[in-house]
């Protein structure tokens, strides 16, 4: 068979996203491709194509920024790395005409963060990869799952929901703002007995990566009980950064204003042991804060990549919530908690490990998971479903 000429039309038609080759039982060599729409270097003004892979080349790694290399005389850019056989994560490309974003040969963490902040608004998904969505930072990303990546319950066999989610507008007197909220119900159990799950960053789980098919699938397979799901929009990054980190007003507004509104539409159980609060990053911090401060209402906490360093971004001081646990100001006694963090988000992992060590005496009701991934919704979506399964498992015994 004649080899295709690199950069020819037929060569590009043979490409369907990243390609990998097994190196050994644990590692693969992975090559990424991008086609320059301006053509070869003779015609193109593109100087760099940055590769932003969550948990591999992002600012969490404090690593040298990585750029694709052009194959001379062609419209082909490529970049090769090595990934674990069980790795899963999202990535994007950032073509740019500038070559001065990262000035130092080895930028420090702050410069890395600032450089990526400037570049990411220009990020694009991989045009060769059909699996893409709008990430939490607002830019497009694509999915990469290596052959031995762990199963993600519900996402492996999604089912269309019988009833669509209902979108409402919550106008909060306490918070003095308005936002969208999505209400989703599954199953046909007696309404007042249905458990409740509150999902933070609701617009992401409702629109960018809709959870309805995965929840429907797991309910049909009896891995999740019939339930009511409430997805709360964060409004924008400014409101998110103010309302989610340890904010009593936000959670009082949820309890006093939003939940009665939801209950009139979709009745649910008031029992704390049937109620889950789930969140990621600031949302993970917020979920545990709610459980620790209102355990009579929120008895189950699902925290993924929780920002337990808050409010000390450098990671050199213990976060506020951990300090409160250590001094006895709050207690996790009686809560069921799922705590998950990625090995490729070092500062987040360190803070979560410190928190887990503090919670470890309650190990019967703590589920601790380390994921081979970064600060990444593609990882979180599987942990979200598994976390709901773990936290609500006792309900199946209640009904039997």
Regions found by a protein language model. Give the residues of each.
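Short beta-strand segments enriched for Tyr within beta-sheet-rich domains
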Residues: 87-95, 194, 250, 254, ...
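The feature captures the conserved acid-bearing segment of alpha/beta-hydrolase catalytic domains
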Residues: 309-378
């Amino acid at each position: 068979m004649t080899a295709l000429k690199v950069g020819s039309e037929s060569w590009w038609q043979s490409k369907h996203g990243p390609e990998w080759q097994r190196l050994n039982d644990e590692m693969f060599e992975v090559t990424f491709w991008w086609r320059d729409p301006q053509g070869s270097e003779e015609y193109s003004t593109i100087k760099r194509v940055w590769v932003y892979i969550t948990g591999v080349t992002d600012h969490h790694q404090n690593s040298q920024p990585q750029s694709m290399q052009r194959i001379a005389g062609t419209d082909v850019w490529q970049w090769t790395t090595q990934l674990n056989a069980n790795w899963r994560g999202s990535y994007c490309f950032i073509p740019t005409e500038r070559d001065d974003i990262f000035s130092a040969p080895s930028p420090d963490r702050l410069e890395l963060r600032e450089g990526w902040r400037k570049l990411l608004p220009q990020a694009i998904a991989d045009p060769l990869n059909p699996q893409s969505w709008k990430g939490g930072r607002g830019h497009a990303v694509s999915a990469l799952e290596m052959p031995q990546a762990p199963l993600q319950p519900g996402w492996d066999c999604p089912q269309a929901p019988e009833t669509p989610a209902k979108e409402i507008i919550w106008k909060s007197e306490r918070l003095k703002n308005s936002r969208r909220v999505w209400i989703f119900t599954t199953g046909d159990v007696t309404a007042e007995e249905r458990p409740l799950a509150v999902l933070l960053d609701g617009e992401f789980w409702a629109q960018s990566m809709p959870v309805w098919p995965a929840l429907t699938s797991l309910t049909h397979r009896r891995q999740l009980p019939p339930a009511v799901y409430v997805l709360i929009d964060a409004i924008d990054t400014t409101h998110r950064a103010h309302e989610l980190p340890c904010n009593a007003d936000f959670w009082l507004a949820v309890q006093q204003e939003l939940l009665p509104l939801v209950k009139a539409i979709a009745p649910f159980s008031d029992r704390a042991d049937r109620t889950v609060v789930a969140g990621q990053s600031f949302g993970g911090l917020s979920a545990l804060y709610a459980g620790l401060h209102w355990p009579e209402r929120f008895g189950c906490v699902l925290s993924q990549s929780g920002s337990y360093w808050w409010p000390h971004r450098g990671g050199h001081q213990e976060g506020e919530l951990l300090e409160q646990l250590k001094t006895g100001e709050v207690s996790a006694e009686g809560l069921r908690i799922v705590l998950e963090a990625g090995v490729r988000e070092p500062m987040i992992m360190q803070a979560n490990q410190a928190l887990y060590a503090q919670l470890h005496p309650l190990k019967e009701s703590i589920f601790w998971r380390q994921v081979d991934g970064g600060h990444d919704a593609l990882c979180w979506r599987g942990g979200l479903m598994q976390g709901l399964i773990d936290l609500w498992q006792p309900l199946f015994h209640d009904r039997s």
